[in-house]
């Protein structure tokens, strides 16, 4: 018997190495078609989900101030209650589990954890307890917590005191906030994001003024209460990058986070030329990608801004000191990507130099259709995002080719349905367009991984629930669960819920059918069973075939094979060698 064990040990060691090194099968479109340990999750943010804005010691954030002071800019709606995740998180985590999701990406409210924004004024114990309870509930349900430090909602007090991200003071306050998070939650949270979508924060917050803090030049938007669209986007972005680097420094010093990973999340669209025959439009595409991606990716990888951004912005783009550059370089363990849609780009002449602003510095204009009136995909006519799944694959290949194939996670991907009050609940629940959107994007993601070699390791759906969508209020719905805002915020599954359940349901399927397991429940002392099992393993070693290829063979062929070689493939798994490999 000792020899039997020795032979099996050698064979299974060899086979395990071969099986686990096999690539996923691109012909299989479910969880099995993605690499081992690929993470599927849903995503949310504190302000859009939690509610309870005046409970638990929380102070007003910039979005509380923005939505209450200028309600006309958020459709006369606010997130005081949002979807009440603060009180209902346990039930919502059950929904995640029922969806067969692996992870949940959420953000921590700086204003809830440190109400004044400054550690010297004290950490809010109730805030710490809430997030610890949330994390514990996730872990207890087998859901991996993925925490974002900043998703657009710093305390309004920092805005009042020194102008928020327009001041370098915020870098050290963000460092302190991050340190508290790592010390309090780092033992159970291993996936961290520093800043969510710095491009959106700076452009929408400081150029167009559509989002908090709502600043811009008066000639851009008369509703803005102050600002300079030509300089402030670059200044705020600069401090966001330095805040990211400061947080990463603290992360890498903290003992509790040594086995974790941290990165930044960017939000690129994909771009194609408005007129593919126009050299100017093709050059405009390069500038668009430089502003959407390279502007923030170059610093966290190389330690400096890309040359194109320096050329476009001139002396309005701040520069990094040597120490800052060193701090920024290689400051992301992974790159998070939020991808939603694509646009055509047309070159435009240089704008009036007397009225500089970020969106015209780059001499381009986004278009929904190209010069032939062709659009990327369905959606815009329904008030929802255009679906262009090929753009996701192209974004990933752009990053792979330009930045030496870094680790990437898709941190958000989803599509909205515009709810103007005229649609019935049944219409909204029947979200076949959302099913198609996710299916198409996951197929392109699978191709990017398997065929192109992009190192992508996770995909997060935006979002689990309908929620407060910033300046759009509650008029646009991204959730796979419908939230009935008129009926106690009841969660109702849309059709996409069943699609995701089925897509992810194969997580724990065994590699072979073990319905006859008891029939072949032999011991190593049974020589006949032992020889049959070794024969099965040797057969797999020499043929190197997958489960699915086996199942496609004619069943009578297996019968002949068993007759000729004594192979009992059904008994293969009775020893449990390859449980849950895929």
Curated annotation (Swiss-Prot):
Disulfide bond annotation, renumbered to this chain = 216-224
Q: Select a single GO molecular function from the record's annotations and give it.
A: beta-glucosidase activity
Enzyme Commission code(s) on record: 3.2.1.21
User: Where, in this chain's numbering, is a beta-D-glucoside bound?
Assistant: 48, 151, 196-197, 340, 412, 462, 469-470, 478
Enzyme kind, highest EC tier:
hydrolase
Instruction: Say yes or no: keyword Signal present.
Output: yes
Q: Which residues form the signal peptide?
A: 1-21
| Gene3D superfamilies membership | Glycosidases (3.20.20.80)
**Could you identify this protein by its name?**
Beta-glucosidase 28
Q: Which organism is it from?
A: Arabidopsis thaliana (Mouse-ear cress)
Q: Encoded by which gene?
A: BGLU28
Alphabetized UniProt keyword annotations: Disulfide bond, Glycoprotein, Glycosidase, Hydrolase, Signal
- Name the protein family: Belongs to the glycosyl hydrolase 1 family.
Catalytic residues? 197, 412
| Enzymatic reactions | Hydrolysis of terminal, non-reducing beta-D-glucosyl residues with release of beta-D-glucose
Residues annotated as glycosylated are: 255, 330, 370, 430, 521, 544
Sorted alphabetically, the Gene Ontology BP terms of this entry are: carbohydrate metabolic process
